């Protein structure tokens, strides 16, 4: 196995930068950089590091050596903590590249080696990637649980039950003349039924884990000049959309990212929807707005308190569902009695975006819907389409299983189910998917 290195921290100015080296030559490389031979595992040392050929000083650093297998990758590992300077990073990188037998790591290669050395399974590796990419508290909770092995434990439990069924069935096949009790087949049937129900229910999760991982899409919908862009700017706490009293100012979808109650929200301000427009570009914007609303996880539909009759058209009303927040904007410009019937019919919130009236109620409603759609529970959810695909295949094989069929074919259904579950955690040969998983990591991880 080659020795690899990379800067694990972000490149640029910082208090500290961390370089990681992994592989059989790690300790030798450290000795070349420092001129010291007596490093003990798991002790931090304050050292000078120099360019091996010229002895030019690179930096005063902290270094630590982890002897195999007691490291993240399971190999000999060295970490070098330098000052966070671009010049130091470049000098150290060049010095390492000039040492024979060491190369720059590929994206995710350290974690890939940890997997190959049985330090973690594939779900934990994916959890680490999600942890690095987590931007909200709820994303962190989900990722840290997965990185800690909770998904692995769940899938391994199912696989263990399948392997037990497999062993009982193979005993029937291999020893047909033996007097095997009927209770054995009863156990197979009962376990099979439980697994079918459990995996079916698990798949019927409304993609909560995947929504939390990727973010919930929220579309702001309404007629032109109702205050959609002003609401987007309020939610983002900065001006990212042009606000104008000219109808049709927003022509395309404007997007921003937000953390509401720990949930990742992808905000989309859309073109105003109206029934008639002679502007070809605006017509395309309206088409995109409707499509955006149809694919959104959460919708905010805005009505104009001064123009309720024109605000409410069929295209907009048809978009309302259980995950829609309807609001009447500009309530400061009209008497409450004039909007009472519409407010009750569509369960609207009364707000004024311009004057910051009741806007906190919008945030609370978004958080409540997000919690219902992607709320954190004790049972780990599916977080990745790869897992879902294998679980659907597993359920297909499991559903096909029947003791009324040929016993050899029934056994093969169980074997294929176990293989699908094993492919999620990586206990079977999954070389063809490793590149796809680890390419999404950053260099140095």
Swiss-Prot record:
Subcellular location: Cytoplasm
GO MF, one annotated term: GTP binding
Positions that bind K(+): 225, 244, 246, 249
Cofactor: binding details: Binds 1 potassium ion per subunit.
Cofactor or coenzyme needed: K(+)
Any single Pfam family the record assigns to this protein: MMR_HSR1
Family listed: Belongs to the TRAFAC class TrmE-Era-EngA-EngB-Septin-like GTPase superfamily. TrmE GTPase family.
Its biological purpose: Exhibits a very high intrinsic GTPase hydrolysis rate. Involved in the addition of a carboxymethylaminomethyl (cmnm) group at the wobble position (U34) of certain tRNAs, forming tRNA-cmnm(5)s(2)U34.
Descriptive protein name: tRNA modification GTPase MnmE
Organism: Rickettsia rickettsii (strain Sheila Smith)
């Amino acid at each position: 196995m080659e020795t690899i290195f990379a800067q694990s921290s972000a490149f640029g100015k910082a208090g500290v930068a961390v370089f990681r080296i992994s592989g059989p030559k790690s300790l030798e490389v450290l000795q070349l950089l420092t001129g010291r031979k007596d490093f003990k595992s798991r002790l931090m040392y304050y050292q000078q590091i120099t360019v091996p050929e010229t002895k030019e000083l690179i930096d005063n650093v902290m270094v630590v050596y982890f002897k195999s297998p007691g490291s993240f990758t399971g190999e000999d590992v060295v970490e070098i903590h330098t000052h966070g300077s671009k010049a130091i990073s470049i000098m150290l990188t060049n010095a390492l590249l000039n040492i024979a037998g060491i190369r720059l790591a590929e994206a995710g290669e350290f974690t890939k080696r940890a997997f190959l050395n049985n330090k973690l399974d594939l779900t934990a590796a994916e959890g680490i990637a999600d942890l690095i990419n987590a931007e909200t508290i709820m994303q962190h909770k989900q990722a840290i649980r997965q990185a800690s092995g909770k998904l692995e434990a769940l899938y391994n439990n199912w696989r263990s039950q399948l392997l037990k069924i497999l062993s009982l069935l193979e005993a029937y096949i291999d020893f047909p003349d033996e007097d095997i009790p009927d209770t054995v087949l009863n156990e197979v049937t009962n376990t099979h039924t439980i697994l079918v129900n459990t995996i079916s229910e698990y798949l019927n999760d409304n993609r909560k884990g995947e929504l939390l991982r990727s973010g919930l899409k929220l579309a702001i919908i309404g007629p032109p000049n109702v205050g959609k862009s002003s609401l987007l700017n309020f939610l983002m706490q900065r001006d990212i959309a042009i606000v104008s009293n000219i109808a049709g100012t927003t022509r395309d979808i404007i997007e921003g990212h937000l953390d509401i109650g720990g949930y990742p929200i992808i905000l989309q301000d859309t073109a105003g929807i109206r029934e008639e427009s002679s502007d070809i570009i605006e017509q395309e914007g309206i088409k995109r707005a409707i499509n955006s609303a149809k694919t959104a996880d959460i919708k905010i539909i805005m009505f104009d308190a001064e123009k309720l009759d024109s605000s409410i058209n069929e295209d907009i009303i048809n978009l309302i569902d259980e995950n829609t927040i309807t609001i009447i904007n500009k309530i400061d410009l009209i008497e409450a009695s004039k909007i009472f019937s519409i407010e009750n019919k569509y369960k609207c919130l009364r707000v004024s975006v311009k004057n910051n009236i009741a806007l906190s109620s919008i945030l609370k409603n978004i958080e409540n819907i997000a919690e219902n759609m992607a709320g954190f529970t004790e049972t780990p959810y599916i977080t990745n389409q790869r897992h879902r695909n294998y679980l659907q295949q597993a359920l297909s094989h499991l559903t096909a299983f029947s003791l009324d069929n040929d016993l050899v074919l029934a056994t093969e259904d169980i074997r294929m189910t176990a293989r699908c579950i094993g492919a999620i955690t990586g206990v079977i040969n999954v070389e063809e998917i490793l590149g796809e998983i680890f390419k999404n990591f950053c260099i140095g991880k």
